[in-house]
Every structure is written in C-alpha cells, then in structure tokens.
Amino acid sequence: MQLTENGAHLTYCTNIHPGESWLEVLTNLKQYLPALKSRFNTEYFGIGLRLSHQATIQLQAAEIAEFKAWLVEQGLYVFTLNGFPYGGFHNEVVKDKVYAPDWTTPERTNYTKNLAHILAELLPEGVKGSISTLPLSYKPWFNSSSNINQVFKQSTINLVEVVIFLVNLHQTRGKFIHIDLEPEPNGLIENSAEVIKFFENWLLPLGGKYLANKLNLSLNAAETLLREHIQICYDTCHFSVVYENPVQVFRDFKQAGISIGKIQISAAIKNKLPQEKSERANLAESLQKFAESTYLHQVVAAYADGTLQSYIDLPEALEDLKETTAQEWRTHFHIPIFNQTYGILQSTQDDILTVLNLLKSYPCEHLEIETYTFQVLPENLKTDLLTSIQREYDWVIQQDVENFNLYSSQFKKPLLKIP
C-alpha cells in the first residue's frame, strides 16, 4: 500500500513463502495477496517480491505480461525485490550458502541485472524501484586482508557494471532503480562503519573512476550516479544484533552522503545474561528452540567494557553460555514484530520504533516487513500465516497512528494510479 502523497510504500517480503520456481511464486502470490489486500481498506497494495535465479530465468516476456495483467486486475503493484538469496531459501539447509554466489561472481551480477530488467517491467509509472542484495560476501570465508581486498575490488567492479545497466534502464525506459546493500552480522559489510568505509575506500574512488571511464563522465558525475543507484537496505534486525544505535547510524549515513533506500522492518532476539547458573540453564532451554538447521542465526555478545564477540551460529554460542562473562546476547532470528517478549526472551522491537520515528527527519520511500522465518519458528509461536502477516501490518500502522503521525490515515486512500 502507498502510505503518503510523497511516495512512501509499505509491503511485506514474499520470501516468507516457500517456492523457487516462477510457478511456485505465482501460486503463492495468488493464494495470499488478494486475501491479504481484502483485509485492508486500500485500493492498491504493494508487493515486496522475492525471486530466485531460477524464477528470473523462467519469467520471460509472456509470463511478465500475464503477471502484469493479473497485478492490474487485483489492484497490486511491485515496487521492491529481495535479491539477496540467489538459490533455494526454504526446506533445505541454507546457512552460509545464502551468500553464494557473492558479488565477486558474474552469476551474482547477471542475476541482479535480470532482477532489474523484471522490476523495470513491473514498476508503475512514477514509482522508484529497489532491489536489496547481500553485503558483498561472507566474512568467515576469508582469512587474510589481501583476500578480502580482492573481494572488495571485484565486488566494486561488478556493482558498477550493474549501475551502468540501471543508468541505461533509466535513460531508455524512464524507470529508476537502486541496489540496496544489506549489512548483516558476519557479512563482509556488517555495520555502519564498514558501510562508510566501503563507500569511501572502494565504491567511490575505484568505482567512480571505472564508471567515469565506461560512460565518459566526470568523476563528480560518476560519483553522483553511484550514490543514487547504490544505497543501503537498513534491516532493523541486523543492525540491532550488532548493537547499532539507529539515531547515530542515520546521522552518520547522511553525513557520509549515503542513502537508505529501503528499510526492512524486523525484530531480533535479545537477552541479558543472568548470573545464576540455574537461570542460564533456563535461558539455554529457551534459546535452543531457535537453534534450527535451515538458516544462520548469528549471535553477538556484548561485554561490560563495550567489546563485542561474534558467533557464527546459535549452537556455537550456546556452547559458551554457561561460562561466558558477557552481559547481553543478541541473536539473528527474525521473530514476529508485534510481540515485545517471548517468554524470558525479549525482542529488539524498541529499535523498530526508533527507526519509524526517525522517518520524520530521514524519509525513506520503501518499507518492507520481513519475517521470513515463519516455517522454522518454535511451534508455540506459529499461528495462521495470513493472520500473522496481517498482525505485522496492523502493528506497524498502529504505531504510526499512535506515535509518529507520519502517514495518518492516508494508507486508506487510493493514492497510486496504475495504468
């Protein structure tokens, strides 16, 4: 749904639905989207679409035309894509495979170009498009600074090749699309400082020169295009896990000239570590329910002196729980955003509220609810999927109406005109 006259859109990410082929994706969309839209008083309803590499290959001109006709018929529109997972994302062990192929590869580059081509076909006139993507690569894969520098270099070149493709799309089709790097724990870019360092050390100097040479531009013009077409996807769960202060992050990004193109509204698990061994046993029992085998659930521990310790996955962290002197753990597990507590565990919902409040001063056009873990939630947290998605929408809208007044009741108005 479009939330404001100036172009803010709210959706949920369809990566919550299993399905890698285009037929599976379309079947899910037809099952859930019209039913979900009917629960809201809105004429047009936005979609945050996740397409695997397989689906992008299958989604040819005829399929796109058929899909567009269905979207118009249903009052639906696509404005953002999730281009992070390339391959299978459900019903298999994903873990660190979600980072492959990474941004050093032609496969990732071509996949993202395919996504941009599809999104340009689907975008309504006058609506900007976004594609979120992985934070270049996965840090634990590399054991030397020289290896990492090579990854930064090749990733920069490949990102610029996509920017060239996007510039051409904008010039020839009138559709503006930006790629949004999505930092997360243990990603090659995992926090705001690393985002800024990547822009200042790699994207702007190396990428700017490469783009200027390719398009015969001045360095200033090339830098402007890079800043426009390479932005950041601020996932509230990810930034919370690494203990980032949203106020400081938004301020630092603005000062560095880095735009947040998309906000993924999601919550992580957080918990203070009790001193009593019996209480730690109870905590271990509660956390163990989230130590499932499909996705990585990175843990970041905070110590009294301010230092942080990162664990690759929750089972590894649980081995240290009895003896660790850390004061707090935060776990990368996207839990439903409408609850503040889960038994003795807490959520990082407060950071979502802070981010929503920041939108008054730092507008962002694309907001996407992203709780993709429904299938792997502990059984006691599972409810009817459609109802759960609706509750997340209701919570976001209610927070705005009660606290921020960014959108007032405008989400009810048919603001978007689809030809």
Language model: regions and residue ranges:
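Flexible glycine/acidic-rich beta-alpha junction loops that bind and position SAM and/or redox cofactors
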Residues: 85-94, 134, 138-141, 241-243, ...
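Acidic-and-aromatic substrate-binding clefts and catalytic sites of carbohydrate-active enzymes
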Residues: 18-26, 50-63, 139, 186-190, ...
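N-terminal pre-domain/capping segments
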Residues: 1-121, 126, 226-229, 370, ...
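Hydrophobic faces of well-ordered beta-strands that scaffold small-molecule active sites
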Residues: 8-14, 43-49, 78-83, 129-133, ...
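Active-site acidic/histidine proton-transfer and metal-coordination neighborhood
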Residues: 92-231
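Well-ordered, non-membrane alpha-helical segments in soluble/globular domains
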Residues: 25-33, 60-67, 115, 149-165, ...
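Acidic/histidine-rich catalytic cores of soluble enzymes
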Residues: 169-318, 326, 335
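Flexible, acidic glycine-rich loops studded with aromatic residues
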Residues: 303-406
